[in-house]
C-alpha cells in the first residue's frame, strides 16, 4: 500500500495532480479542498494517500490532511459509495461539515453534494452515525435547547452556515418564540 507521497508537483488538472517522486510520476486524484490548498507547479508537496486496486485500474487518492483521508476511508466502506462519490462528497463539504451533518442527522446538507441522492444521504447518516464525528473531533455546534434549536435548524435549512447561524442565535434574547426568533435572526443576518 502507498500511504504517503512526497515530491515535486508537475501538473494540476482538477481533480487530478501529477506528482514526481524521484523520477516516477504519480497521478493522484484529490478532493477540491486539498486541490485549492496546493502550492504552485514546481513546488514540493506531501500527500497522504489511499491506494485503490480494482479489476480494471489501480488508483491513488491524495489528501492534504489525515482527517480527510480518514473520512474518505470511512465513506468508501459504505455500500453504494465508491471512491469517486467519496471524493465528490469531500469536495462538496469540509470534513468538519460532513461530521457535523452526520452528528445532527441532516440529510438535506448531504443531498446538496452533486451525486448524492436522498437514499444515499440516508445510508450515510445511518452507517456513519457515531463513527465519523468522534474520530474527527467534530464540533456539534453551539449548545442550544428548545426554541433556539428550532431557530438554528431553520437557519441551517435556509442555507446559512453554522457560524452565521450561531452568531444570529447569540444576538437573540434567551426566552424567544420560534417565529419571532427566526424573524430577528434573519434581520440580523441581512445587516
Curated annotation (Swiss-Prot):
Role: The RuvA-RuvB-RuvC complex processes Holliday junction (HJ) DNA during genetic recombination and DNA repair, while the RuvA-RuvB complex plays an important role in the rescue of blocked DNA replication forks via replication fork reversal (RFR). RuvA specifically binds to HJ cruciform DNA, conferring on it an open structure. The RuvB hexamer acts as an ATP-dependent pump, pulling dsDNA into and through the RuvAB complex. HJ branch migration allows RuvC to scan DNA until it finds its consensus sequence, where it cleaves and resolves the cruciform DNA.
Protein name: Holliday junction branch migration complex subunit RuvA
Region (Domain II): 65-140
Pfam families associated with the record: HHH_5, RuvA_C, RuvA_N
Location(s) in or outside the cell: Cytoplasm
Keywords: Cytoplasm, DNA damage, DNA recombination, DNA repair, DNA-binding
GO biological process: DNA recombination; DNA repair
Entry annotated with the keyword Cytoplasm: yes
HAMAP family in UniProt: DNA_HJ_migration_RuvA
GO cellular component, one term: Holliday junction helicase complex
Annotated segments matching region Domain III: 143-191
Amino acid at each position: 500500500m502507498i500511504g504517503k507521497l512526497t515530491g515535486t508537483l508537475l501538473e494540476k488538472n482538477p481533480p487530478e495532480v501529477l506528482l514526481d517522486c524521484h523520477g516516477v510520476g504519480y497521478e493522484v486524484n484529490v478532493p477540491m479542498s486539498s486541490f485549492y490548498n496546493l502550492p504552485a507547479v514546481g513546488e514540493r508537496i506531501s500527500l497522504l494517500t489511499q491506494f485503490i486496486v480494482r479489476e480494471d485500474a489501480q488508483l491513488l487518492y491524495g489528501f492534504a490532511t489525515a482527517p480527510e483521508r480518514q473520512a474518505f476511508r470511512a465513506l468508501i466502506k459504505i455500500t453504494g459509495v465508491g471512491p469517486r462519490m467519496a471524493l465528490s462528497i469531500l469536495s462538496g463539504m469540509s470534513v468538519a461539515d460532513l461530521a457535523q451533518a452526520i452528528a445532527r442527522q441532516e440529510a438535506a446538507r448531504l443531498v446538496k453534494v452533486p451525486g448524492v441522492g436522498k437514499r444515499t444521504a440516508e445510508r450515510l447518516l445511518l452507517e456513519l452515525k457515531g463513527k465519523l464525528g468522534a474520530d474527527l473531533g467534530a464540533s456539534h455546534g453551539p449548545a442550544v435547547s428548545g426554541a433556539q434549536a428550532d431557530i438554528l435548524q431553520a437557519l441551517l435549512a435556509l442555507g446559512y452556515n453554522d457560524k452565521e447561524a450561531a452568531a444570529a442565535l447569540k444576538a437573540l434574547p434567551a426566552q424567544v418564540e420560534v417565529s419571532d426568533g427566526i424573524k430577528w435572526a434573519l434581520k440580523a443576518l441581512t445587516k
